[in-house]
A protein has these predicted regions:
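Long, low-complexity, intrinsically disordered segments
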Residues: 162-164
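Conserved switch/coupling elements of ABC/ABC-like ATPase nucleotide-binding domains
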Residues: 145-151, 156
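ABC family nucleotide-binding domain
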Residues: 1-143
Length: 165
């Protein structure tokens, strides 16, 4: 694949969720979620359908016209997740998706990611330092200083890995 083909493949197959929501403050939730679709050949009506569906999937259909400043941190992260899934990617990569949230909101986000995996058959790769996340995943792969050191079945290991000296 050349660079252009690789970029097109990534755009079609990978959705990204970041620790910091990266929402544009001057855009509504609807407009933030619509952004990736502006690069497609979808009509305005088709984009509207996709955005409404994505916001419904993250339980924010009633917040479409809200700006980020009008949302809680957990709601902002759900808008970011809706933006990541609006193109219906095969793989969702979540980089510390709960790192900036309180415990309750973090659990809601982890439950939402689990639901997306089960209901919509999304492969989710999540990077986190939070061992509490393990109970929400199928497999945990552990790295220490960038080196793979093993894997376990999710939910099985409640003890955080001790970093090497």
């Amino acid at each position: 694949m050349n660079e252009r083909e690789l970029a097109a493949w990534r755009a079609r197959h990978i959705g990204l969720v970041y620790q910091f929501y990266n929402l544009l403050p001057v855009l509504t939730a609807f407009e933030n979620v619509e952004l990736p679709l502006l690069l497609t050949h979808l009509s305005k009506a088709e984009r509207k359908t996709h955005v409404e569906s994505a916001l419904k999937a993250v339980d924010l259909a009633d917040r479409m016209e809200h700006y980020p400043r009008q949302l809680s941190g957990g709601q902002e992260q759900r808008v970011a997740i809706a933006r990541a899934i609006v193109t219906d990617p095969t793989i969702l990569i979540a980089d510390e998706p709960t790192g900036d949230l309180d415990a309750k909101s973090a659990e809601e986000i982890l439950l939402l990611l689990t639901q997306l995996n089960r209901q919509y058959h999304k492969t989710i790769v999540m990077v986190t330092h939070d061992p509490r996340s393990e109970r929400f995943v199928d497999t945990v792969y552990r790295l220490d200083k960038g080196v793979f050191i093993g894997s376990t079945t999710g939910g099985m290991s409640a003890t955080p890995l001790q970093p090497s000296e």
